């Protein structure tokens, strides 16, 4: 997605450890127009899949997931990372390791909002090692729901996440695919 790549070039910052900081438009300050276009793109890519719900992990996946849900006229469920006093029973859970934060979080989705005949689309801001998507897949397995695929805003193609998901038969659609973050420079995969 050209517009997204331009935003990354203009506002993205490469940090040590192959970290790409995009807090100017995605995961701190949010560019609503860009998120709308991202939602439209995912809606188009997954239009004929019979999807019933959009799933993501809080918090950076929420904006693109909500815009995708808006475009597809579908509810969005975000897996919570922190325990809630109001959501404490009848939960599907999975442990997810965060590459950038170097912590493990237990994510959870209430069984109340998951139906046995659901077909879900997972949306996430980044795909590097695939831990967030793996956590959602674990919850999908627990719930017995179908998975249409994963819509990823930014994929770090030089890390194993996308390849491992594709090997498992998971459809992965990434809007910006990064080949390298070497020398503090973002290089995109050339299609």
Swiss-Prot record:
Function: Converts the preformed base xanthine, a product of nucleic acid breakdown, to xanthosine 5'-monophosphate (XMP), so it can be reused for RNA or DNA synthesis.
BP-aspect Gene Ontology terms: purine ribonucleoside salvage; xanthine metabolic process; XMP salvage
Cellular component aspect of the GO annotation: cytoplasm
Gene3D superfamilies found in the cross-reference section: 3.40.50.2020
Protein known as: Xanthine phosphoribosyltransferase
Binding-site list for 5-phospho-alpha-D-ribose 1-diphosphate: 128-132
Principal location listed in the UniProt entry: cytoplasm
Its EC number(s): 2.4.2.22
Stored SUPFAM superfamilies: PRTase-like (SSF53271)
Catalysed reactions, semicolon-separated: XMP + diphosphate = xanthine + 5-phospho-alpha-D-ribose 1-diphosphate
Ranges in coiled-coil conformation: none
Family the entry assigns: Belongs to the purine/pyrimidine phosphoribosyltransferase family. Xpt subfamily.
Database matches in HAMAP family: XPRTase (MF_01184)
Entry GO MF terms: xanthine phosphoribosyltransferase activity
Originating species: Limosilactobacillus reuteri (strain DSM 20016) (Lactobacillus reuteri)
InterPro entries: PRibTrfase_dom (IPR000836), PRTase-like (IPR029057), Pur/Pyrimidine_PRTase (IPR050118), Xanthine_PRibTrfase (IPR010079)
Name of the coding gene: xpt
Subunit and interaction comment: Homodimer.
Keywords: Cytoplasm, Glycosyltransferase, Purine salvage, Transferase
Transit peptide in keyword set: no
Protein residues bound to xanthine: 20, 27, 156
UniProt pathway: Purine metabolism; XMP biosynthesis via salvage pathway; XMP from xanthine: step 1/1
The keyword Glycosyltransferase appears for this protein: yes
Cell compartment(s), UniProt: Cytoplasm
């Amino acid at each position: 997605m050209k517009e997204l790549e331009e935003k990354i070039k203009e506002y993205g910052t490469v940090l040590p450890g192959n970290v790409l900081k995009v807090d100017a438009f995605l995961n701190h300050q949010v560019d609503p127009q860009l998120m709308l276009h991202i939602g439209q793109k995912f809606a188009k890519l997954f239009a004929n899949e019979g999807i019933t719900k959009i799933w993501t992990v809080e918090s950076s996946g929420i904006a693109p997931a909500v815009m995708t849900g808006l475009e597809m006229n579908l509810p969005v469920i975000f897996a919570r990372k922190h325990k809630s006093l109001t959501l404490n029973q009848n939960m599907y859970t999975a442990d997810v390791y965060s590459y950038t934060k170097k912590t493990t979080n237990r994510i959870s989705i209430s069984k109340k909002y998951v139906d046995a005949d659901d077909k879900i689309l997972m949306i996430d801001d980044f795909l590097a090692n695939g831990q967030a998507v793996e956590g959602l897949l674990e919850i999908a397995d627990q719930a017995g729901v179908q998975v249409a695929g994963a819509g990823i805003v930014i994929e770090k193609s030089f890390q194993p996440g996308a390849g491992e998901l594709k090997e498992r038969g998971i459809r992965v659609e990434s809007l910006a695919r990064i080949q390298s973050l070497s020398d503090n420079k973002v290089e995109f995969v050339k299609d």
